[in-house]
């Protein structure tokens, strides 16, 4: 059975997190009934983003250039590196206005059940960056979970021969909580009260 344009759009919107069939249908009907021009603008912006946004060659954050704006910024503290799971976490920390160093985005956590090992999340690239840029402190800003603890352990082992301090965010971030959904004050407090890791 072939789908018509309306059904295809409803089905396409369901790929977004938290959007079920009813929500997707409401969005489509709203755009068709009240916001056709904005719907066309949305489609155009989405197409441009999908075509032109890729990953920064140094930190893996999203960018339209070879290096993202944060990596290019000479005013950032290049001796301080914050390691996060996703570009959404970079955005959350930046909104807290509590960190002036550089970032490295892992694009996930080590998870054998999902087939993700150290190489899949870019740990060799992380080590290379730390050595090349002479990083003095690595802050592990990972959401609390079993996979995060596994990832932290692997990073610590990877860097054991490097002359670099390794710390992680202080408690206050709820277990199982996602960094991108926390308010700026919580993130700021966790960064300021980060703890040195002893594995």
UniProtKB/Swiss-Prot annotation:
Function: May play a role in DNA repair. It seems to be involved in an RecBC-independent recombinational process of DNA repair. It may act with RecF and RecO.
Keyword line: DNA damage, DNA recombination, DNA repair, Metal-binding, Zinc, Zinc-finger
MF terms in GO: DNA binding; zinc ion binding
Family of the protein in this entry: Belongs to the RecR family.
Protein name: Recombination protein RecR
Classification via Gene3D superfamilies: 3.40.1360.10, RecR Domain 1
Hydrolase among keywords: no
Alphabetized SUPFAM superfamilies for the sequence: Recombination protein RecR
Annotated organism of origin: Legionella pneumophila subsp. pneumophila (strain Philadelphia 1 / ATCC 33152 / DSM 7513)
Domain (Toprim): residue spans on this chain: 79-174
A Gene Ontology BP annotation from the UniProt entry: DNA recombination
Chain intervals annotated as zinc finger (C4-type): 56-71
